[in-house]
């Protein structure tokens, strides 16, 4: 007799950004394994729903086989499924959630850096990894002599330091900056520079993807990441990435597939300390990148693409295995 398909409940904040992308990726991977997924808001279910879920759980017939929490923790969802797992982002993890970690059957970590953090908190943590969408348009697409910096709505992507570097170097190639205010009316620092183009309005996904594939050099000096979607997307395009020499950024981007910039700690965020690149080191990294012959650029970009493909396959395999084990 064929076993019924597993029922997985994805619990997340549909923010139109990183968490939405995470949910889309997880749901897509599980669907290829014939696993049904339902999306639920991260706020707790209504009281009547929780009561019904407890009755179902006690009777051995919970609504779902597995809850997968993306970043947020709310134990009131636990009765809705036989098992509960968490895929956290350490930089957004609230300290008050720590006491709930032991209530999860597993904490699935996106990076080895995250794994060490959650193991130290006593969680039943294991390495899952993660992936990004494949952003490559066509292999071998001609590149332009320009540089791309995408910050989205974040103020923690090193944008100010990148712009300060370009202020000092009017001879550098054109920098394209994609950054929107984190909230309406917020003043962004976008100084008028002859070799900088700003996109401070919302671009379509197609427009962003075209930019990612147009430029061979992407500058992504993040202060903190849960996984590193920005770098993974850049490497999927075969771009050379300049980023922060601190975890987890330097776990994804290694010297054979990018350029790492020394950083210093600044302020705590969640379970981590933010890391800010040093301005002279960033300038040196850009100078080094611009001096690379085309053959070296292509070799480094090819290494990044190869890493993305290997990592993507491994993540998909691990996620399917973890969820299948619930059945």
Regions found by a protein language model. Name each.
Residues 240-243, 248-253, 259-260:
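Short hydrophobic beta-strand element within catalytic cores of glycosyltransferases
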Residues 185-209, 217:
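Nucleotide-activated donor-binding/catalytic signature segment of Leloir-type glycosyltransferases, i.e.
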Residues 223:
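Aromatic "clamp/platform" in nucleotide-sugar-dependent glycosyltransferases that forms part
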Residues 96-97, 126-146, 187:
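Acidic anion/phosphate-binding donor-loop and adjacent secondary structure
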Residues 1-70, 317:
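N-terminal pre-catalytic "stem/leader" segment of glycosyltransferase-like enzymes
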Residues 277, 290-324:
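A charged, aromatic-enriched C-terminal amphipathic alpha-helix characteristic of glycosyltransferases
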Residues 40-117, 121:
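Extended catalytic core of nucleotide-activated donor transferases of GT-like folds
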Residues 138-157, 163-167, 175-176:
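Conserved donor-binding/catalytic core segment of Leloir-type glycosyltransferases
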